[in-house]
């Protein structure tokens, strides 16, 4: 510190404090800036003593000046500070830092010529002379010479690494020290680092990767002329295969210089940043202030982590402004928010200096006392005198008691009293409030009879003075009273028992002592000499002080010091105090205090103490199923990264008591693995408990559904809280714990795996939900009984408390519940505690008088997939409980059939209209109301034109909830049946939510309802209801009879269809010899059956018996449909209405039943057969002649794609193997080419899908890597892209584009040198694009608009090429075809696992095996050698080919694999 203190003295120090940091700013230089600058000089190998003179500062500036343009912010701040110190030494008058810099520049140029302007680029440019800068390469006499790095520089680098251990400061330090260095110099710096070889290895790996990437991007152009300097390779840049002379020539040659030094520095910086992240794994988002942590300590940790973050300054600025306040503890956050927007760091540190734990408060108290007692502070640290040592033994200054040679004095060295030593001295105890004579006025104040002064720890008797024996006697009495506890409350809490010296006397052992929850301030009413006072019980205060009472004139004046300052008080002794019906006598002070406080002197006299109640949740006994044993599955291998993550998780859980180590006698094991969480930064441990779930006894879900806000009674106050770590708070029964054992393996089996068992409910185990629900019910049941007027709704870990109590009483109940849960080991996080509306609960927003759904925003998309529609329908169904009129019928029709989740959906006009109507409905906010038991509950049902039923459940005009019903299970339905289903749904819903049946308002006439209900009462359950008729439904009835009609004609109907040609027949035969057949086209089996039934109805009389063999037709007729979406069913309904009586019966098909057998033969002739078998031989001949492709064969001959592909695969001429022919363009589905072109002074970036010719383009502001990367991200978010081909432009080879390509998973390739056609597709498309723009240029003003218009024309208005399609159609067709091919290949791979043995003709010998190609209804396709044969099914045996058995473990123990015998 000597050099630092002597840098500036006297007037120079005063002059420093007049200079502003910034022009026009408020802040000025302080002595701390000099100290900081002296510390920083050591990093650059510069002595601190250089700051003491003008010449020394000039030497420092000579070293720092060349590094300023490319240096870090710390380097620039150091340079600025030295400039100011130089000006003070030179007696130059300056006002701010900028003025000092200008003067220094001017003087250095005039005197030494060394402060010339630095280059604006980061590429090293050697100065013009030896004195030109701190460069290893100097320009002397027109030649560049290399000067090795000085030992001082190397020493500074080594010291930086050793001190900071690869902290965040290493990267800017390396940048500053290696400025202008060659690869040789940089390697010399790396070789100086002796330790940290792991970090050095990481840097070497980065160098190897970057060198290989350099070689790929910069291929060797070819042979060079003799004497010409070769181009550098990656190893040359790394300095392993190049000399210093070659490196200097590459760096400073006139034509195309290659800054190998800067390139190598960038590689090293990438490696150093990786090491910094490894050595500093703490994320800045995890830096949070502890509850008692001083704010300054938290800020230090925050900025240390911030320096390790490799991000933009703008992002760091945002982190500083947002995260610093957001992650502070609640006390500091409250203080910081009061400072307004964007406070400075100095303001925040000043405001929060009083917030912290006891240690922080003690330090601040000491500082406050020092300012009051001690002499006035001297302005500068250099002028302050060191405090003299004083010996406690002899009283002399200059040495300590340990060094004292005088005889040892008996008694305490602190207070001088005998009977105890200094470590036990009561005067050493520090308190939050302390009394005693302070400052200069203290001797003038009246003193008490004791010469020892005020007692800071009053004894229970209230005496502030006395002998040592009395003090110890009182202390022992108090401690003994604290140790004697009594049993309190039914949860086993303990409370202190008072000592026997109180007026009231000792309490009985059977009584429970008072308890104070710490969720709010412990404030009680005390009576001081009969005067009531509200006081705070403060265990952190030594003494007691109150305001607003009069206790007479028998007092002693005292000064009390605290965080808030110092106040004058009156001290009264032996005052009678009554608290909670208990009386004591103690010392108390009165004064102007902001809050009345009872400190430890009164609390100990009352026998109070702090107690931590520990309650217990009894575990539930669980058994395995009879005859079952626990899982004994092997742990599969895991990656090293996952093993380390699991170890960290398990160690944390073991410390928290959730896991314990399994004994070696435990035979059970369950596989464990890890997955990344959503933020991709943390890991989640998963245990595969499927096998344990199989053998564990069954459980019943106690909670059958989710509570609904419409079922809540209307209450004045609501509070919502959450139970944290729900499962991990409940113990698992000890007898069951061994079955949960799992193992953490080690890499390469380096050590035995560590085994754990669960002590709490595991996640993923089937018993955890039921046990948690049962436990929560047991925990809350006594609380519910004790507070019957309070509503407590609990679903899993969400708890809602509602009551009509006053605010104080309601808050008290909530705090009691939190205390109960916390006492049982459950946590209730403050961040999820909701005290004020709106309350976010179970997806709802709750208010005291109403409830809403949380904000619903329907997405806006250009392209919708099946998964998007599913999510949309789910959101709309959720909204339908409050928003009347929500419809999803046509939206659901968009995803009918077998569709993949990612398949694009084609919208219909009806669906678009339905979605827009729903958007309008959701834009009008709706409110639901709470249930009032005394009012009538009503349900009104309505039906719209589209057969959708809506209902609302209300009390008078207040709607509780609404709903819709559109579950039409069949295409053909009956309105009365649907109405019954609606009533059933409402009835069940009302019973669950309110426990009562509402009064219904239904749109049907009573007579029609009762007529239908008499026949179909068994269809479903309908609750009792009061009938209120609204405008009725129209109901059509037809007379179906239950027995055959004697004398009526009987019709046997049947229909058939060929699946391939879609041709079919429908017909009937009668018992009177009539028959009729009708040919059908583009039909199905079901449609043919319905046609036959309709023909029978049309051709029969008023009474008829119809026999069908189709359950489909039978079901439709029996349900008496009144409406249908099918034209043929509507025709059947019309015909059935005309009949007087109809009897419909069903018989099984193909069973030889008379009538049915005849009509079956009638309609099956020429229809039910395999139509494509006879087309295989012509297809083979066609391919042998013309070598047609798969699509042509399938299209022309109507054979399946799989058969056509097998024909092509069997042709030797049509198979191409090996690599693609050199020079051909890669036309795979995911291949795109990208290039930039120019038009009208604008830059247009163009991307072309090679296979289809589809084009994407837009105008970008500059041809940079960032803009190119953004365009690539847009492209990849719209279309599948796996391979990107570009030229070698700087924007395409930039780090931004590489990073995007890596993140998306794109293979990137570049143009081949001397082959401009390697990206010829996009080059040609640039030409076509410009031609198209020229044709339509008049239609738009800006080039941005006309580019997009031209793209539309080229993608959608240009047909031709492959398939005679537009590029957009071709691209979509290719994507769809690729999906179909993948499906067929998967199907084909399954068929290849089977072998066929067959017989041909009359030959009884079995032949084969052959390869199964196709399995039809009547025959199979078999490949034998090169022949494809058609074998009838009756002459073929299909056997699975399992291959040869392998003598090895059949179970797969790889990560994620399933074991047939062990896992479901």
Curated annotation (Swiss-Prot):
Lipid-attached positions, N-myristoyl glycine: 2
Region described as Disordered: 111-136, 432-500
DNA-binding region location: 1394-1441
Domain Integrase catalytic: 1224-1375
One CC-aspect GO term: virion membrane
InterPro entries attached to this UniProt entry: Aspartic_peptidase_AS (IPR001969), DNA/RNA_pol_sf (IPR043502), Gag_p24_C (IPR045345), Integrase-like_N (IPR017856), Integrase_C_dom_sf_retrovir (IPR036862), Integrase_C_retrovir (IPR001037), Integrase_cat-core (IPR001584), Integrase_Zn-bd_dom_N (IPR003308)
CCHC-type zinc finger span: 389-406, 410-427
Composition skew (Low complexity), residue ranges: 456-469
SUPFAM superfamilies (UniProt xref): Acid proteases, DNA-binding domain of retroviral integrase, DNA/RNA polymerases, N-terminal Zn binding domain of HIV integrase, Retroviral matrix proteins, Retrovirus capsid dimerization domain-like, Retrovirus capsid protein, N-terminal core domain, Retrovirus zinc finger-like domains
Essential for RT p66/p51 heterodimerization (site feature) positions: 1012, 1025
The keyword Transmembrane helix belongs to this UniProt entry's keyword annotation: no
Needed co-factor(s): Mg(2+)
Keyword field: AIDS, Aspartyl protease, Capsid protein, DNA integration, DNA recombination, DNA-binding, DNA-directed DNA polymerase, Endonuclease, Eukaryotic host gene expression shutoff by virus, Eukaryotic host translation shutoff by virus, Host cell membrane, Host cytoplasm, Host endosome, Host gene expression shutoff by virus, Host membrane, Host nucleus, Host-virus interaction, Hydrolase, Lipid-binding, Lipoprotein, Magnesium, Membrane, Metal-binding, Multifunctional enzyme, Myristate, Nuclease, Nucleotidyltransferase, Phosphoprotein, Protease, Repeat, RNA-binding, RNA-directed DNA polymerase, Transferase, Viral genome integration, Viral nucleoprotein, Viral penetration into host nucleus, Viral release from host cell, Virion, Virion maturation, Virus entry into host cell, Zinc, Zinc-finger
Gene (UniProt): gag-pol
Domain RNase H type-1 intervals: 1045-1168
Cofactor note: Binds 2 magnesium ions for reverse transcriptase polymerase activity. Binds 2 magnesium ions for ribonuclease H (RNase H) activity. Substrate-binding is a precondition for magnesium binding.
Residues with PTM Phosphotyrosine: 135
Chain segments carrying region Interaction with Gp41: 7-31
Residues given in the record as Mg(2+) 2 binding sites: 1054, 1089, 1109, 1160
Record-given protein name: Gag-Pol polyprotein
Species for this entry: Human immunodeficiency virus type 2 subtype A (isolate ROD)
């Amino acid at each position: 510190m000597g050099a630092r203190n002597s840098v500036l003295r006297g007037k120079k120090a005063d002059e420093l404090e007049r200079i502003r940091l910034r022009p026009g700013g408020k802040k000025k230089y302080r002595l701390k800036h000099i100290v900081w600058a002296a510390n920083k000089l050591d990093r650059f190998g510069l002595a601190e003593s250089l700051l003491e003179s003008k010449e020394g500062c000039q030497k420092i500036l000579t070293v720092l000046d060349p590094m300023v343009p490319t240096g870090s912010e710390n380097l620039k701040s150091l340079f600025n500070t030295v400039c100011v110190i130089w000006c003070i030494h030179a007696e130059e008058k300056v006002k701010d830092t900028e003025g000092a810099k200008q003067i220094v520049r001017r003087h250095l140029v005039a005197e030494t010529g060394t402060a010339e302007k630095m280059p604006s680029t980061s590429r090293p440019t050697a100065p013009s002379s030896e004195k030109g800068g701190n460069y290893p390469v100097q320009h002397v006499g027109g030649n560049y010479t290399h000067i090795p790095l000085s030992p001082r520089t190397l020493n500074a680098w080594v010291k930086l690494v050793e001190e900071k251990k690869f902290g965040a400061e290493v990267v800017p330090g390396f940048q500053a020290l290696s400025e202008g260095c060659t690869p040789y110099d940089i390697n010399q710096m790396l070789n100086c680092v002796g330790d940290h070889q792991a970090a050095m290895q990481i840097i070497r790996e980065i160098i190897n990767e970057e060198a290989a990437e350099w070689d790929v991007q910069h291929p060797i152009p070819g042979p060079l002329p003799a004497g010409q300097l070769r181009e550098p390779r990656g190893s040359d840049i790394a300095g392993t295969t190049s000399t210093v002379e070659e490196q200097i020539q590459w760096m400073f040659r006139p034509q195309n210089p290659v800054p190998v030094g800067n390139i190598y520095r960038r590689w090293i910086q990438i490696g150093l940043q990786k090491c910094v992240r490894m050595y500093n794994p703490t994320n800045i988002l995890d830096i949070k202030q502890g509850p008692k942590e001083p704010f300054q300590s938290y800020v230090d940790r925050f900025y240390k982590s911030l320096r390790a973050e490799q991000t933009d300054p703008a992002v760091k600025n945002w982190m500083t402004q947002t995260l610093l306040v957001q992650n502070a503890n609640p006390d500091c956050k409250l203080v910081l928010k009061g400072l307004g927007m964007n406070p400075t760091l100095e303001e925040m540190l000043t405001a929060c200096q009083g917030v912290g734990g006891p240690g922080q408060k003690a330090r601040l108290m000491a500082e406050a006392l020092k300012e009051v007692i001690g002499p006035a502070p001297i302005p500068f640290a250099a002028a302050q005198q060191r405090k003299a040592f004083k010996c406690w033994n002899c009283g002399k200054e200059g040495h300590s008691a340990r060094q004292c040679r005088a005889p040892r004095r008996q008694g305490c060295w602190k207070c001088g009293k005998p009977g105890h030593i200094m470590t036990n001295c009561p005067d050493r105890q520090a308190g939050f409030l302390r009394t005693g004579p302070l400052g200069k006025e203290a001797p003038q104040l009246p003193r008490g009879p004791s010469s020892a002064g005020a007692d800071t720890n009053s004894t229970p008797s209230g005496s502030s003075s006395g002998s040592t024996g009395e003090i110890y006697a009182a202390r022992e009495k108090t401690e003994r009273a604290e140790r004697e506890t009594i049993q309190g409350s039914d949860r086993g809490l303990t409370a202190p028992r008072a000592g026997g010296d109180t007026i009231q006397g000792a309490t009985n052992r059977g009584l429970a002592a008072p308890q104070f929850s710490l969720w709010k301030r412990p404030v009680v009413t005390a009576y001081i000499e009969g005067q009531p006072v509200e006081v705070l019980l403060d265990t952190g205060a030594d003494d007691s002080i109150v305001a607003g009472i009069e206790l007479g004139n028998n007092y002693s004046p005292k000064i009390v010091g605290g965080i808030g300052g110092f106040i004058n008080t009156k001290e009264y002794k032996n005052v009678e105090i009554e608290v909670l019906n208990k009386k004591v006598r103690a010392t108390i002070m009165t004064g102007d205090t902001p809050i009345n406080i009872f400190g430890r002197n009164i609390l100990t006299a009352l026998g109070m103490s702090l107690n931590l109640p520990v309650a217990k949740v009894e575990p539930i006994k669980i058994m395995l199923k009879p005859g079952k044993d626990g899982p004994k599955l092997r742990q599969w291998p895991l990656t090293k990264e996952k093993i380390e993550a699991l170890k960290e998780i398990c160690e944390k859980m073991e410390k928290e008591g959730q896991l314990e180590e399994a004994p070696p006698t435990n035979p059970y094991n369950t596989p464990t693995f890890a997955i990344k969480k959503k933020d991709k930064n943390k890991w989640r441990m998963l245990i595969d408990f499927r096998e344990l779930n199989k053998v564990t006894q069954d459980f019943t879900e106690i909670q059958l559904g989710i509570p609904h806000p419409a079922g809540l009674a209307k209450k004045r106050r609501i509070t919502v809280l959450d139970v944290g770590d729900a499962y991990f708070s409940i113990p698992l029964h000890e007898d069951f714990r061994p079955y949960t054992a799992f193992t953490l393996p080690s890499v390469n089996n380096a050590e035995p795996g560590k085994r754990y068992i669960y002590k709490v409910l595991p996640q993923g185990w089937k018993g955890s939900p039921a046990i948690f629900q049962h436990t929560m019910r047991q925990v809350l049941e006594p609380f519910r009984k004790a507070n019957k007027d309070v509503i407590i709704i609990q679903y899993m870990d969400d708890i809602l408390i509602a009551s009509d109590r006053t605010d104080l009483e309601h808050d008290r109940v909530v705090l009691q519940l939190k205390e109960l849960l916390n006492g049982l080991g459950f946590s209730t996080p403050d961040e999820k505690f909701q005290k004020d509306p709106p309350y976010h609960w179970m997806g709802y927003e709750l208010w005291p008088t109403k409830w809403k759904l949380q904000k619903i925003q329907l997405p806006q998309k250009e392209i919708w997939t099946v998964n998007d529609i599913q999510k949309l329908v789910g959101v709309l169904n959720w909204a339908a409980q409050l928003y009347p009129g929500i419809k999803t019928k046509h939206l659901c029709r968009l995803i009918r059939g077998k569709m993949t989740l990612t398949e694009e959906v084609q919208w219909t006009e009806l669906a678009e209209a339905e979605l827009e109507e729903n958007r309008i409905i959701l834009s009008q906010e709706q409110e639901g109301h709470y249930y009032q038991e005394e009012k009538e509950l009503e349900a009104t049902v309505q039906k719209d034109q589209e057969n959708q039923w809506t209902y609302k459940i209300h009390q008078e005009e207040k709607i509780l909830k609404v709903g819709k019903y559109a579950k039409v299970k069949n295409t053909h339905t009956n309105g009365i049946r649907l109405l019954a289903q609606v009533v059933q749904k409402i009835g069940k819903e009302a019973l669950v939510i309110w426990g009562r049946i509402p009064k219904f308002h239904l749109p049907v006439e009573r007579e029609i309802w009762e007529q239908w209900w008499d026949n179909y009462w068994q269809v479903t359950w309908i609750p009792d209801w009061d009938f209120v008729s609204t405008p009725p439904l129209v109901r059509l009835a037809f007379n179906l009879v239950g027995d055959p009609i004697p004398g009526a004609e009987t019709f046997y109907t049947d229909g058939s269809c060929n699946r391939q040609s879609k041709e079919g027949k429908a017909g009937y035969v009668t018992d009177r010899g009539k028959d009729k057949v009708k040919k059908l086209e583009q039909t199905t089996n079901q449609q043919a059956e319905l046609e036959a039934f309709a023909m029978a109805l049309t051709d029969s009389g008023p009474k008829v018996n119809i026999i069908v063999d189709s359950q489909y037709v039978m079901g439709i007729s029996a349900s008496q449909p009144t409406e249908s979406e099918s034209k043929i069913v509507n025709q059947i309904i019309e015909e059935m209405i005309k009949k007087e009586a109809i009897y419909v019966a069903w018989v099984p098909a193909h069973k030889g039943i008379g009538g049915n057998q005849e009509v079956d033969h009638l309609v099956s002739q020429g229809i039910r057969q395999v139509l494509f078998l006879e087309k295989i031989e012509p297809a083979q001949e066609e391919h042998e002649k013309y070598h047609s492709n798969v699509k042509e064969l399938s299209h022309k001959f109507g054979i399946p794609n799989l058969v056509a592909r097998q024909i092509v695969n069997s042709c030797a001429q049509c198979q191409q193997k090996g690599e693609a022919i050199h020079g051909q363009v890669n036309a795979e589905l995911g291949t795109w080419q990208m290039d930039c072109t120019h038009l009208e002074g604008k830059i247009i970036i163009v991307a072309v899908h090679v296979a289809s010719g589809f084009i994407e383009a837009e105008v970008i502001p500059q041809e940079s890597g960032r803009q190119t990367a953004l365009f690539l991200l847009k492209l990849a978010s719209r279309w599948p892209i796996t391979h990107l081909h570009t030229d070698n432009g700087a924007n395409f080879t930039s780090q931004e584009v590489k990073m995007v390509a890596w993140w998306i998973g794109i293979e990137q390739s570049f143009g081949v040198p001397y082959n401009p056609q390697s990206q010829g597709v996009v080059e040609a498309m640039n030409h076509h694009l410009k031609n198209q723009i020229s044709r339509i240029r008049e239609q738009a003003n800006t080039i941005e608009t006309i580019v997009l218009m031209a793209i539309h024309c080229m993608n959608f208005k240009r047909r031709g090429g492959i398939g005679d399609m537009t590029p957009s159609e071709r691209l979509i067709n290719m994507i769809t075809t690729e999906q179909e091919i993948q499906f067929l290949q998967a199907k084909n791979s399954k068929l290849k696992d089977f072998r066929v043995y067959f017989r041909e003709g009359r030959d009884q010998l079995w032949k084969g095996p052959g390869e199964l190609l196709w399995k039809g209804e009547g025959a199979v396709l078999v490949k034998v050698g090169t022949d494809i044969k058609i074998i009838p099914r009756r002459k073929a045996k299909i056997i699975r080919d399992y291959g040869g058995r392998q003598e090895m473990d059949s179970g797969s123990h790889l990560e994620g694999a399933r074991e047939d015998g062990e896992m479901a």
